[in-house]
Amino acid sequence: MSRIKKKFGNLLGLDKYFWSSRPNGLYSVNFHRIGDSADTQFDPCVYSCSTKELEQHLTFFKKHFRIISLSALSEYLRTNEKINERVMCITFDDGYIDNYSNALPILKSLNVTASFFIATGLIGNTVVPWWDKVAYLLKTYDPKAIKLSGWSEKVINQHDGDHFIRAVLASIKHCKRTAEEQIKELEAYLNHSG
C-alpha cells in the first residue's frame, strides 16, 4: 500500500513539496556497502544500495540539502552557530573496499563530500567481520547436514532464523563442553605420564 501511496504522491508532485518543506537543521545519512547484494557470499543486508541508486540518492540530496563534511559540522558545534538551512552529513561505515571502488567515484563525479569510518582492526589481515561470517555460514551450510551426535531422530528445519541460530548455538556449547572434557583428559594423561 505504501508503494501505491508513494507513486500517487510522486504523480501529484507531493514528493517535491515534502522535501522542500522539511525544517532547517542537520540531517545525517549513513551507508554501508555499495553494490549488488545478490553478488555477495557474505551478508547481503549490509548493502545499502546499488551504485545506480547511490547516484540517484546523492543527486537528490544535493538538490534538497547543503551537504557538509563532519569538519564543517564540528565547526557548527564548536561555535554554537544556529543552522538556518537544511544541511546533511553523509557517512559510510566499516570501510569495505566497495566504498572506495564504487562509492568514491560517484561522490567525486557529483562533487559530494562524505566521511568514511574504517574498521581499522580489519586492515592488513584476512579477518572477516562476525556478521559476514554468520551470513556466509547461513548461506552455505545445509541445516540437514548437521550431525548431532547423541541425538536420535532430531531434525533441524529452518522454520525461522531464530530456531536455526538456537540450534547452532546449542551445537557450539556442545562442542565447547566436549573440548573442555578432552583437555581435562589430556591434562590427566600428561600428569600421570610425566
Q: Where are these predicted regions, by residue range?
A:
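C-terminal domain-boundary segment and adjacent tail
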Residues: V46-K82
